[in-house]
């Protein structure tokens, strides 16, 4: 299979160049300064303190590998359902070309509930970090496979200066070594290889011994059943980012509760 990640990054750079023309930095800074902030990391820790799994529930219409996951897609309704059934935070896809996401979806989901929201996208430039704050995100995703370490460190520092939490995502030990140079406590292990889109939850289990105890491990992708959840919890993983299993269910929030609570 061709390298999907490289294709996505190329498109992102084209999108940034176009966005700079339509929404200059100064305009975004004004929008960003008007946004309130919700404590993303704190919401996860509160769930842990209460003895519960911390679920980052994803609002995702489609993916490159699976196509459309949910035809009746109303972000506000999905967000409310997640909040009512015990989610700690939301993750909203804002990539349009590959995941049929939108900044509007993030705004709609955040307005519908009180949960902190992660902007799920392929961030390669500081402009996108500011853009995330302007659209109302409380956290951003930094993907180690898409960034060199100095840039990742710079983007994290900029995000923190704007009041954004950072989830750094890795898929292998080499990426983990670089990700641990960041300050964020949130380390996501993506069970899906972004270059091939092959998925196995053994990816998370095989990397746990290399992660310091002061980091919060977030297992991402491939968590599709209660059995998957129990396997992770038995290994000491209590923070999950889940999208597909919920999106395919008739009631996303009820499926969250069934799998986790």
Swiss-Prot record:
Pfam family, one: IGPS
InterPro entries: Aldolase_TIM, Indole-3-glycerol_P_synth, Indole-3-glycerol_P_synth_dom, Indole-3-GlycerolPSynthase_CS, RibuloseP-bd_barrel
Superkingdom of the organism of origin: Bacteria
Catalytic function, reaction form: 1-(2-carboxyphenylamino)-1-deoxy-D-ribulose 5-phosphate + H(+) = (1S,2R)-1-C-(indol-3-yl)glycerol 3-phosphate + CO2 + H2O
Gene3D superfamilies linked: Aldolase class I
Alphabetic keyword roster: Amino-acid biosynthesis, Aromatic amino acid biosynthesis, Decarboxylase, Lyase, Tryptophan biosynthesis
Pathway assigned to this chain's UniProt record: Amino-acid biosynthesis; L-tryptophan biosynthesis; L-tryptophan from chorismate: step 4/5
Molecular-function GO terms, alphabetical: indole-3-glycerol-phosphate synthase activity; phosphoribosylanthranilate isomerase activity
A Gene Ontology biological process term: L-tryptophan biosynthetic process
Top-level class of the enzyme under EC nomenclature: lyase
EC number: 4.1.1.48
SUPFAM superfamilies: Ribulose-phoshate binding barrel
Family: Belongs to the TrpC family.
Protein's name according to its UniProt entry: Indole-3-glycerol phosphate synthase
Source organism of this protein record: Burkholderia pseudomallei (strain 1710b)
